[in-house]
């Protein structure tokens, strides 16, 4: 039985979570993204003190590794790597989009499409089923009124995240569902424990966040004519 620290600074708010295996024993968050760099160390210290657990008892650290805020990702990854290096414990990286789906799994939908705002009409996105199987790989796309049209003909898709508002203004399909769902470090726990059991670890020395830079030149226009299921 082991303690795990989970860090998320990828989107709007920063949060840290302490779990005893899959059981959450402590959680703290900070809603201001611009304060993540100054808050994260203090937040972790306060979390551990409130829980009465020493850092030396941690078995691993997990971090939301992107896509997301460039600055936020750097802050979270640097913090996680520093702790893992100092404590000589494994680093576990979790895709931010998949973390978001964990927060939405109990919703009534066949497929889940988290969207992270990029710029203009662009979003980082992917599509997953209830078992977190990747239906459409994470990528950056330019939204239009034909995006996801082929899948929406036969499947109900839940769109959520801080980029989904842009798509809600475009799409008319009855199979397109929208809901505000907040994801945070607590939603890293299950995947992180599974990765730990399977010894799926990142390289502490060379691991970098997934910024999604490659998709900016140019961004994929939309999902129509591609990614059929």
Language-model features, listed with the residues they occupy:
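N-terminal beta-alpha supersecondary unit
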Residues: 1-65
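Conserved hydrophobic/aromatic positions in well-ordered beta-strands
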Residues: 17, 124-128, 210
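Surface "functional belts" at beta-alpha junctions
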Residues: 23, 90-183, 216-217
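Residues at secondary-structure transition points
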Residues: 31-42, 70, 74, 78, ...
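Stable alpha-helical structural segments in soluble proteins, enriched in small hydrophobic residues
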Residues: 47-51, 86, 104, 185-196
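DPxDG-like acidic metal-binding loop motif
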Residues: 60-96
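Acyltransferase
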Residues: 177-229
């Amino acid at each position: 039985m082991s303690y795990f620290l989970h860090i998320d600074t990828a989107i709007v708010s920063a949060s840290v979570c302490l779990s005893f295996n899959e059981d959450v024993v402590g959680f703290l968050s900070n809603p201001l993204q611009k304060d993540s760099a100054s808050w994260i160390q203090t937040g972790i210290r306060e979390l551990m003190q409130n829980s009465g657990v020493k850092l030396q008892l941690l078995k691993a650290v997990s971090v939301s590794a992107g896509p997301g805020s460039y600055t936020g990702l750097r802050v979270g990854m640097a913090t996680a790597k520093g702790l893992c290096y100092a404590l000589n414990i494994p680093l576990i990286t979790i895709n931010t989009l998949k973390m978001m789906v964990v927060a939405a799994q109990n919703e009534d939908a066949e497929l889940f499409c988290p969207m992270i705002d990029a710029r203009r009409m662009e979003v980082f996105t992917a599509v997953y089923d209830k078992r977190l199987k990747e239906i459409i790989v994470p990528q950056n796309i330019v939204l239009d009124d034909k995006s996801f049209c082929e899948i929406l003909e036969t499947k109900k898709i839940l769109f959520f995240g801080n980029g989904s508002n842009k798509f809600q203004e475009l799409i008319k399909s009855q199979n397109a569902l929208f809901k505000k769902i907040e994801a945070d470090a607590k939603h890293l726990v299950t995947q992180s424990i599974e990765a730990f059991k399977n010894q799926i670890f990142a390289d502490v020395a060379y691991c970098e966040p997934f910024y999604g830079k490659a998709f900016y030149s140019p961004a994929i226009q939309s999902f129509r004519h591609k990614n059929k299921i």
